Amino acid sequence: MNVFRTLTSLVVVFAAMSLTAFAAPKSIKVATDATWPPMEMLDAKKQIVGYDIDFLNAVAKETGLAVEFKNTAWDGIFAGLDTGKYDAVISSVTITDERKAKYDFTDAYTSIGQILVVPKTDKTSKTIADLKGKKVGSQIGTTGAMEVKKVAGVESKTYDEIGLAFEDMATGRISGVVCDEPVAAHFALKKKEYKEKFKIVGKAFTKEGYGIVVKKGNKELVDQLNKGIKAVKAKKLDTRIHTKWVK
């Protein structure tokens, strides 16, 4: 009888442990690199704000999640996810086959493209290829950097933060910057110190979807976030967020 009770207790314990291990979380820590305006950035009070922040907060509200955002440098953001320091990453992360091989993604919550920014004094360049023999900047590890490296004859120069690339272009150290459309618009069209110096040329030359990244195999969290994403889109909350930050 004692053996039976012991075995029964063990079964109950293991079952409880299994349920706990795979239950959808009630709170999550989320990493973001707040140097990518207007998607994620720091405001005057050093608070993390932006499109992605508002979007995930809306998703969290729809699913009953509590979210704690952590400002994390891009070059270490995925390592933190690997080690369990964060439960998810939302930082304008393009869904690619290479990234999907290592991580799980939610459904795409918005779409963007890469675009080229050059000085207004450049009257001829319309594409990256037009800058052969010159340096073109981008943020390290981004799809923008990947696009620059595809073009023969162009020298790729990468930066830890995209703002540093625009600083270098303002001083003539590089001849162009490639980044996501909303970021390009922020620096070239809205930023006081740059809007008279830079211009966006051509059209977006990629079509990319942003997804929220989680550790491989965490289906419960992906499903929970996808449920929230669908609810946010159904209520057109994403349109309001887009209008607030991008338009």
Segments from the language model and where they lie:
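Short helix-initiation/N-cap motifs at beta->coil->alpha
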Residues: 53, 68-79, 123, 140-143, ...
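Periplasmic-binding protein-like
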Residues: 34, 110-118, 181, 185, ...
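A ligand-binding cleft/hinge motif common to bilobed small-molecule-binding domains
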Residues: 79, 91-101, 147-150, 175-206
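Extracytoplasmic small-molecule ligand-binding "clamshell" domains
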Residues: 24-92
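Ligand-binding clefts/hinges and TM-proximal coupling segments of bilobed small-molecule sensing domains
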Residues: 66, 143-159, 196-201, 227-247
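Extended ligand-binding regions for polar small-molecule ligands
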Residues: 53-62, 122, 129, 134-135, ...
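A conserved helix-loop-strand patch within extracytoplasmic ligand-binding domains
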Residues: 65, 69, 93-95, 105-156
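Alpha-to-beta junction loops
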Residues: 64-66, 83-91, 134-135, 171-183
